[in-house]
Amino acid sequence: MQRPIIIRRALLSVSDKTNICELAKSLLKRGVQLISTNGTARLLVNAGIHVTEVSNYTGFPEIMDGRVKTLHPKIHGGILARRNIDDTIMQQYKIEHIDMVVVNLYPFAEVVASATCNHEKVVENIDIGGTALLRSAAKNYSNVVVVVSINDYISIINEIDCNNGAVSLETRLNLAIKAFQHTATYDSQIKDYFTSQVYTDSSKCSSIFPPILNINFVKKQDMRYGENQHQLAAFYLDTRNKEKSIATTKQLQGRALSYNNIADADAALECVKEFSEPACVIVKHINPCSVAMGKTILVAYQRAYETDPTSAFGGVIAFNRSLDLCTAQEIIARQFIEVIIAPTVDQEALLILAKKKNIRVLSSGQWNKPIPNLNFRQVNGGLLVQERDLVMINLHDLRIVSQRQPTTMEIQDALFCWKVVKFVKSNAIVYARNQRTIGIGAGQMSRIDSAKIASIKAIDNKLNIRGSTMASDAFFPFRDGLDSAAKVGVSCVIQPGGSIRDQEVITAANEHNIAMIFTNIRHFRH
């Protein structure tokens, strides 16, 4: 069995100096010799902590404005030396063992993201010596303790105290894994930055989709189970994300979020973010089952719920305004709910919701314009990567192709349900009237079947389809879609267009006196 390592000598070189003085004092108190680079050493000395500067330890000064500090055989030899194997060479060159390496790196990603970023500053924040120290110490984890996270300082000191100055092999291995993960992430960030500098706008595709894709996700939490109870699962955060999203929400109350809760809440939040006026989105199994706008979110919720009360049971509700007391009371009175998500939640609303301890309440914070990013879909043996579908349309993008011009209300409903249909599984059909969905047909292999389901939902909930607007996420391949819409009383259709039978479909619209709008944008969602 591998013996524990007694800490006698430690090298400290940190960019983030949080709690480093406390760690150094604890080590010094236990008789550990401290070696440190210039900036860290200055801080420690000013705190009254005895430390040997690296340049004094090696007999070689820091040079090139600090670019070369720790890249010296006495440092790396002391870290990489194997006990009982390299002892002779150590004695020959008067190299001492370094038992602990505490390093965190220059803040490269933060510098790149800063408003004052320039290329020279970015390059100078590429840490060379620090990554070399971490890799050397992690490679020799059987003989060295490597510490990259300030969150590990206390636990390491506690272990040293409990083990007479020693750190176990298990701990050393876990710390080495963290160090290699940290350097891998760091190198990936550097690669991404230089990749963005190489490619021009004319080769945008190459810039977004490099030959090798390295993206880092950090575990936020383990889940009780995945989509089904026999599947293990966890939730990871995209380290590049700068946008308000389900990943950045704060849970204010309720049980831990499940895998399906997170998936549904993401769909609901992203859909409600499309609307500028007060809106409510209710989602079940990642599909919107009802969406409505209103003068207040209370009115929006009432209109959305009444669209499809059956499907709303056990769903996720999202708002784009602060959740108030009246709306919270209305939700509790009307239905069982898994998750409520809103930018903020009024204190009075929280107090009433606290009586229903199982309801998960999330605060997303106020969001801004969505940030272009990548969308992933894993297939067996590979990964499909595409840009997020963030295309928005407005009144000026609409192309009216029918003889009858849509009314002002029909145009408003068309723009409304076009926002909704983007979030419905294909083939997707949405009926809307007065900026409220009255029927949604999702996920059917036939577009005509999705249209039939949408009309059935409306009829079952006693909602009048006559005079409504219909949105289709993709073009109608045949006129039967328009014929079906006309039978139930649809007066306006919004769709991408682009079928080889567009003229046949336009003719059908004219025969039924339906106003038809082309967007020239498709919104498949598989």
Swiss-Prot record:
Annotated ranges, domain MGS-like: 1-148
SUPFAM superfamilies to which the protein is assigned, alphabetical: Cytidine deaminase-like (SSF53927), Methylglyoxal synthase-like (SSF52335)
Entry keyword set: Hydrolase, Multifunctional enzyme, Purine biosynthesis, Transferase
Substrates-to-products reaction catalysed: (6R)-10-formyltetrahydrofolate + 5-amino-1-(5-phospho-beta-D-ribosyl)imidazole-4-carboxamide = 5-formamido-1-(5-phospho-D-ribosyl)imidazole-4-carboxamide + (6S)-5,6,7,8-tetrahydrofolate; IMP + H2O = 5-formamido-1-(5-phospho-D-ribosyl)imidazole-4-carboxamide
Listed GO MF terms: IMP cyclohydrolase activity; phosphoribosylaminoimidazolecarboxamide formyltransferase activity
EC number: 2.1.2.3, 3.5.4.10
InterPro entries to which the protein is assigned, alphabetical: AICAR_Tfase_dup_dom_sf (IPR024051), Cytidine_deaminase-like (IPR016193), MGS-like_dom (IPR011607), MGS-like_dom_sf (IPR036914), PurH-like (IPR002695)
SMART domains: AICARFT_IMPCHas, MGS
Functional pathway: Purine metabolism; IMP biosynthesis via de novo pathway; 5-formamido-1-(5-phospho-D-ribosyl)imidazole-4-carboxamide from 5-amino-1-(5-phospho-D-ribosyl)imidazole-4-carboxamide (10-formyl THF route): step 1/1; Purine metabolism; IMP biosynthesis via de novo pathway; IMP from 5-formamido-1-(5-phospho-D-ribosyl)imidazole-4-carboxamide: step 1/1
Pfam families: AICARFT_IMPCHas, MGS
A Gene Ontology term for the protein's cellular component: cytosol
Transmembrane annotation, as ranges: none
A GO biological-process term: 'de novo' IMP biosynthetic process
Domain notes: The IMP cyclohydrolase activity resides in the N-terminal region.
Family: Belongs to the PurH family.
Record-given protein name: Bifunctional purine biosynthesis protein PurH
The species this protein was found in: Baumannia cicadellinicola subsp. Homalodisca coagulata
